[in-house]
């Protein structure tokens, strides 16, 4: 939108919604492919037919992308409620047992213990009441042979490299958060480092020119809350109890970046 409005192609977090004031100071609607597909079905078959599927508060289907320790990482599935995250992973991901943890909502989403995520409904309005979100629709299963903190460190490093370079919290805050998290995972944290990491995350939250820094903070804070046993081991400088060799999440271009 910024580019189309004659400005730099960088993200922004406007105080006034684009639906009220957008390009050329006029109301602007931005839709994703899922919304457009729903509009096509509405136009073809009508509202009565459309509302027969899904929940009354959120009719229609939901697109989800499965990742991590599933049968086919990257698989996009269309689900119609009522259903749960566990049912989706069992049916489409061929996940046979409750995983240790699930990352819900994207790489800037929320880590949840597997037993918690398993029972969650795939309904955006209900998830928001439970403090979770479908976000971009990613459901990523943590491999039992991958440390959740090490996986998070990879994600934070990659996300820090994706900065648009337009504000301090992104330019300076995210690389610092990545470095601090790497130190924790490597078992080199000293007394007070965890507190400093949490304080830095708090200071970055909500301060960026867009939502990118806040999303990274959400990922970090949920990891610290979800992976308690691993966190204690790393803080003591012990070898991680999770054996190496598992399947990590795909991160385009991470290995090519310095």
Protein language model regions, located:
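Structural beta-strand/beta-sheet cores of well-ordered domains, especially the beta-sheet scaffolds
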Residues: 25-28, 35-37, 60-64, 73-77, ...
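Generic beta-strand/beta-sheet core signal
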Residues: 67-69, 79-80, 91, 102-105, ...
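Short acidic/glycine-rich loop or secondary-structure boundary segments that cap or lie
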Residues: 74-75, 110-113, 150
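Secondary-structure transition/capping motifs at alpha-helix termini
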Residues: 93-98, 187-191
């Amino acid at each position: 939108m910024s580019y189309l409005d004659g400005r730099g192609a960088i993200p922004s977090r406007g105080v006034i919604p684009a639906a009220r004031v957008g390009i050329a100071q006029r109301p602007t609607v931005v839709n994703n492919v899922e919304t457009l597909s729903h509009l096509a079905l509405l136009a073809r078959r009508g509202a009565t037919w459309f509302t027969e599927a899904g929940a009354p508060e959120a009719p229609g289907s939901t697109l989800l992308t499965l990742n991590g320790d599933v049968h086919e990482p990257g698989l996009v599935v269309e689900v119609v409620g009522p259903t749960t995250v566990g049912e989706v992973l069992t049916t489409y991901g061929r996940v046979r047992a409750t995983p240790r943890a699930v990352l819900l909502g994207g790489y800037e989403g929320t880590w949840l213990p597997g037993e918690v995520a398993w029972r969650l409904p795939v309904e955006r309005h209900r998830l928001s009441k439970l403090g979770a979100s479908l976000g971009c629709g990613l459901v990523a299963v943590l491999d039992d042979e991958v440390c959740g903190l090490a996986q998070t460190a990879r994600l934070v490093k990659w996300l820090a490299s994706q900065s648009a370079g337009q504000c301090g919290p992104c330019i300076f805050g995210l690389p610092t958060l990545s470095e601090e998290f790497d130190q924790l995972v490597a078992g080199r944290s000293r007394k007070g480092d965890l507190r400093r990491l949490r304080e830095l995350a708090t200071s970055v939250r909500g301060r960026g020119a867009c939502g990118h820094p806040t999303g990274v903070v959400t990922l970090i804070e949920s990891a610290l809350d979800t992976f308690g046993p691993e966190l204690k081991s790393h803080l003591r400088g012990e070898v991680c109890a999770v054996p190496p060799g598992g399947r990590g999440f795909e991160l385009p271009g991470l290995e090519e970046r310095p």
